[in-house]
UniProtKB/Swiss-Prot annotation:
Domain Expansin-like EG45: 69-175
GO CC annotations on file: extracellular region; membrane
Membrane topology: Peripheral membrane protein
Compartment annotation: Secreted, Cell wall; Membrane
Disulfide pairings: 72-100, 103-170, 108-114
Residue ranges annotated for the Expansin-like CBD domain, each copy included: 187-268
InterPro entries given in the database record: Expan_Lol_pI, Expansin/allergen_DPBB_dom, Expansin_CBD, Expansin_CBD_sf, LolPI, RlpA-like_DPBB, RlpA-like_sf
Signal peptide: 1-30
Pfam annotation, one family: Expansin_C
Protein name: Expansin-B11
PANTHER family: EXPANSIN-B1 (PTHR31692:SF21), EXPANSIN-B3 (PTHR31692)
Length: 269
């Protein structure tokens, strides 16, 4: 073996060692640890406070997403009744969209800017950051709402903080709304459900079309949207039955009228 080949072999070994160290330092030792998600948060109330991490995103006094939407499909989280108090729940809170619309009290005690007083937030979006068993990525407005009066901006500068949360019954103060999504057509129904008091989240949607005596289950599409694909035209008026996570069933007779149109909201009476 020549001197040149020996030197080249040494260079190759050094490169391999450098790559291995870079992987260990950059991939395994840097950044926050990956924490597995906690157990799913179900429709139980009056429970003790649970620990979580809180972060925030979007504009400091905004609603979170720039388009006022999010992973639940809502398009108005900056308006009442959400009032920019939206939260991205991690896996056991968002639950692949089945947690959309559920309500939580949140509070923080540290840092000093925290008021310790609970405020209500709504699950409107998702996050998959593995920084804690439970993680709320809050709209800037919602994060600041945990602060003492006048200390909102200082609290937001803290970035990641410890917080406590518990599930509460929703009191939207608005009528249940059924929004037919833009892509709907006579053979395809995509229904966004929002403002459901009580549990807030929906686990089943069944519809009864004009002339039918039986309910047909819709398929969960994504977020708070449920759908039906049909070989025949879907005829109104349509009665909708909602089932919440706690098992409450509510029927909305003929809430979607004959001649229904895409990109239109229909409100329960």
């Amino acid at each position: 073996m020549t001197v040149v080949s020996i030197m080249w072999s040494l260079v190759q070994v050094q490169v391999l060692v450098a790559v291995a160290l870079a992987f260990l330092v950059g991939g395994a030792w840097c950044g926050p640890p990956k924490v597995p998600p906690g157990k799913n948060i179900t429709a139980k109330y009056g429970s003790d406070w649970l620990d979580a991490k809180a972060t925030w995103y979007g504009k400091p006094t905004g609603a979170g997403p720039d388009d006022n939407g999010g992973g639940c499909g809502y398009k108005d989280v900056n308006k009442a009744p959400f009032n920019s108090m939206g939260a991205c729940g991690n896996v056991p809170i968002f639950k692949d969209g089945l947690g959309c619309g559920s309500c939580f009290e949140i509070k923080c005690d540290k840092p000093a800017e925290c008021s310790g007083k609970p405020v209500v937030v709504y699950i409107t979006d998702m996050n998959y950051e593995p920084i804690a068993a439970y993680h709320f990525d809050l709209a800037g407005t919602a994060f600041g709402a945990m602060a003492k009066k006048g200390e909102e901006e200082k609290l937001r500068k803290a970035g990641i903080i410890d917080m406590q949360f518990r599930r509460v019954k929703c009191k939207y103060g608005s009528k249940v709304t059924f929004h037919l999504e833009k892509g709907c057509n006579p053979n395809y129904l995509a229904l966004l459900v929002k403002y459901v008091d009580g549990d807030g989240d929906i686990v089943a949607v069944d519809i009864k079309e004009k002339g039918s005596d039986t309910y047909e289950p819709l398929k969960h599409s994504w977020g708070a949207i449920w759908r039906k694909d049909s070989d025949k035209p879907i005829k109104g008026p349509i009665t909708v039955q909602l089932t919440t996570e706690g098992g409450t069933k509510t029927v909305y007779d003929d809430v979607i009228p004959a001649g229904w149109k895409p990109n239109t909201a229909y409100t329960a009476k």
